């Protein structure tokens, strides 16, 4: 019932149980239904926390993307590589060094932009890859945005990814998915620089 009145929904696989998974799908489907009515645009964000270390989480993520059609798919480099079906090295909730996007390695930025762009085209969702460099790809164009703001200290703070998911959902309630992702990443990254 609550999801039916919400303008946006954020879903995280970070602390998932069977009961939470059921609620996640009920809410995701409610948002999808509401988006297809005269009541205005409604959208969801899925945060792929830990899909590289749990087949249960991976299957939930794939199912949510298929059945609920989120506007935004968010994850670190390992998680996005995994959901895109490309080789990945992550085994936990943190990105592996081999999958990380780094300003010091321009090829990692280009490679991840390509992977995110392909996933965006396949799913119809904006794909947000988080890390030292945030990559945002839209299904509506062939451009991926790379955001180089932030601080190395942000990686030492547990929960910054969850914060970004919530900020993205907040912006998503008032604007399109691409703008919401860019604004959310800039908001958190610039705050991290202070």
Each PLM stretch: what is its role?
Residues 1-26, 32, 114-194:
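Small-residue (G/A/S/T)-rich helix-start motifs and N-terminal tracts that mark the onset
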Residues 2-7, 35-41, 92-95, 101-102:
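Generic detector of short, locally flexible boundary/turn motifs and exposed helical patches
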Residues 10-12, 43-48, 96-99:
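Short beta-strands and strand-loop turn motifs
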Residues 14-16, 49-51, 77-79, 132-133:
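Short, ordered loop/turn segments at secondary-structure junctions
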Residues 20-75:
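Glycine/small-residue-rich loop that forms an oxyanion/phosphate-binding "nest" at active or ligand-binding sites
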Residues 26, 50-56, 79-86, 162-169:
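Low-complexity, flexible helical/coil segments
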Residues 34-37, 68-72, 98-99, 153-154, ...:
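Glycine-rich loops and low-complexity Gly/Arg-rich segments
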Residues 56-144:
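Conserved phosphate/ATP/ADP-binding segment of small-molecule kinases
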